[in-house]
Amino acid sequence: MTTKTTMTEHVAAYLAERSMLGFSISGPGAQLLKSFAGFADGQDCGTLTSDLVIHWAKDQSRTSHPFTWAGRLAIVKPFAAYMTRLDPATEFPATPIFGKSRRRLTPHIYTDGEILGLLAAARALQPQGELRSAVFETLIGLIAATGLRISEAINLRCCDVDIEACCATVRMTKFQKSRHVPFHRSVAEALGSYLQVRGRFVRQEAEQAFFTVAGGQYLNKRTVHGVFQRLRAAVGIVPRGSYPHVRIHDLRHTFICRRLERWQAEGCDIDNAIAALSTYVGHAKVSDTYWYMTGIPDLMAIAGSRFEGFALGENGHV
């Protein structure tokens, strides 16, 4: 007699296939998918149905909010597509019955004065003139100047930063891809100054962490966030976005917004510019970059003004 394959076994096979294709299977999404499989097996349901997945998404959630339920449905959706290859009777809700599964909150956009204040506060970290102050001043400056993710910056190795070529190589990023990130000569000069300080405390080796405070070890992300919050408090920066706290990641948002603001003001071909910027900052989808045009009030105002000019025949393009 043939033994029926359980939903847990189907999920394990699906995750193994995703892993072979280079996708991460260790995040919260994988754990939620395993939770769904366990629930389905407990219901003795051999087939994935709309009723089953809705029941799990809503009634098995710890949060009574449609946004959370929609997110749980979104986790199962790719797996449901996979299951249709194995079981034609597989069902999944055809419409987003709980609404959108993703929402983007407006980030804090730093002023130039706030960024300069953060750099000055980092430079004043005790003991002054030591590696710690140089690390945090340079780290904050690099993220502000290039829009790197914090994880990308702290995972740089010495061999990844080519100061002469003004380019950093970011390896195996958030989406398991690598990319080159060119930077301005002024950034190269700041990085070179940092390396001179670093060299007094740590021997430079190609495979060592570029940003390090002890023994060539990589910075801990939690430590970086903790130090940043102390610097933010020292400067007196208060949040202007939708988040309750100002974050170091907002430096990345600020870089993207300032670049788009400049291109908008200069009347550039914004579609081509956004495509290039999306690649530069490592967005998985160009739509993630377009979001800033509608999600940031300052950019919306510029875009609206340009569209008004276009409608009145003052501009050749929007």
Segments predicted by a language model, with ranges:
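Conserved catalytic core of the tyrosine transesterase superfamily
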Residues: 1-318
